[in-house]
Amino acid sequence: MTEIIEVHAREILDSRGNPTVEAEVTLLSGISGRASVPSGASTGEHEMLELRDGDPKRYLGKGVTQAVNNVIEKIAPEIVGMDCLNQRDIDYTMIALDGTENKGALGANAILSVSIACAKAAAAVVELPLYRYLGGVQAKDIPVPMMNIINGGQHADNNVDIQEFMIMPVGAPTFREGLRMSAEVFHNLKAVLKGKGYNTAVGDEGGFAPNLASNEEALAVIMAAITRAGYEPGKDIAIALDAAASSFYEKGKYILAAEKKPEKTADEMIRFYEDLANRYPIISLEDGLAEDDWEGWKALTQAMGSRIQIVGDDLFVTNKKRLEQGISKGIANSILIKLNQIGSLTETLETIQTAKEAGYTNVVSHRSGETEDSFMADVAVAANCGQIKSGSLSRSERLAKYNQLLRIEEELGDRAVYRGRSALYSVR
């Protein structure tokens, strides 16, 4: 009854109106699993290949019919007949079939869609919640959300360099309360921005995207919103940043257009972050330097890694080998987990385990081009990752993940654990 009898795929649209892959896996029992994959705007150089058609006459070259056909014509014949409960075998069969280092033959988007669809079908056939099927009885940590309430960089059409200014409800007793607190801050931020005459249109991830006087002004208005909502900055609500520094790294320099002194070295960037962390309750910094600036990253970790969380996204791209390289060099103390960066569920879970064994935190993350699929929320709980990024408090493709976590927390009842500030091991 757990045998795969059919694999299908189709082209659907993501939250930016661009095509992406959706796959369906049907079992002998008649049960099926369906999954769609996201797409990033600020993509790491070392990510697995997202296969696009490149035909300018269709979707401006962003069609995914080739990836869809690879699922139907190449992947399906290989995995039909396999047992959906053997996730690792299925994933490594697809990886071997692709045969490239970057999944460039079949496309990471093709492989991942099938990988997740298989997991969903398997959970359904054994009648277990997805997080329980993937994580077993120990799956109980409800992650602390990082909510991107001011969008900049490549996620917005504004003059703010830093890509994400996020809030984390570290003082909440439960996820449900943390979500409420964050929503109240979000709505108060809208009022603060309106009061200053700023635009309150939102960016790709549902956060506000105003033109501000500087990157620091984003922090100032967030602080005002936290206080206006009746919370204490740092104690109830902390701040996290995703600089996405590779996007403003040019010829060995970091160019912050919104700053009075725009051109900075790695050392000057570190001092810039240290100054902000000294004056604002920043507890996490993601991609503070460029993805291949290993020496800069080491200096950043040495300077700030004992007091805040230093997260590698473009640096590690959910890749176990790159993570192991970083661990050996003492670089960062946390990794961002994006399933489509590596392209299979099995490899994602292996990377999460490698990080845990090294004492690194895991932050499960969405992409800027998302779908309504909430699978990543179940993965975060299944692997007890403790933290999740799914955008702001608007746009339903973002809230789908948060709402799924509400359901999981309710289902777990007294067994649910919300760790708050302690989910960030390195924060003092």
UniProtKB/Swiss-Prot annotation:
UniProt: Mg(2+) binding residues: 242, 286, 313
Necessary cofactors: Mg(2+)
Cofactor notes: Binds a second Mg(2+) ion via substrate during catalysis.
Cysteine disulfide partners in this protein: none
CDD domains from the UniProt entry: enolase
SMART domains cross-referenced by the UniProt entry: Enolase_C, Enolase_N
EC number, UniProt record: 4.2.1.11
InterPro entries: Enolase, Enolase-like_C_sf, Enolase-like_N, Enolase_C, Enolase_CS, Enolase_N
UniProt-annotated binding residues for (2R)-2-phosphoglycerate: 163, 338, 367-368, 389
Pathway assigned to this chain's UniProt record: Carbohydrate degradation; glycolysis; pyruvate from D-glyceraldehyde 3-phosphate: step 4/5
Cytoplasm recorded as keyword: yes
Gene Ontology cellular-component terms listed: cell surface; extracellular region; phosphopyruvate hydratase complex
Function: Catalyzes the reversible conversion of 2-phosphoglycerate (2-PG) into phosphoenolpyruvate (PEP). It is essential for the degradation of carbohydrates via glycolysis.
HAMAP family: Enolase
Listed name of the protein: Enolase
Lineage: Bacteria, Pseudomonadati, Thermodesulfobacteriota, Syntrophia, Syntrophales
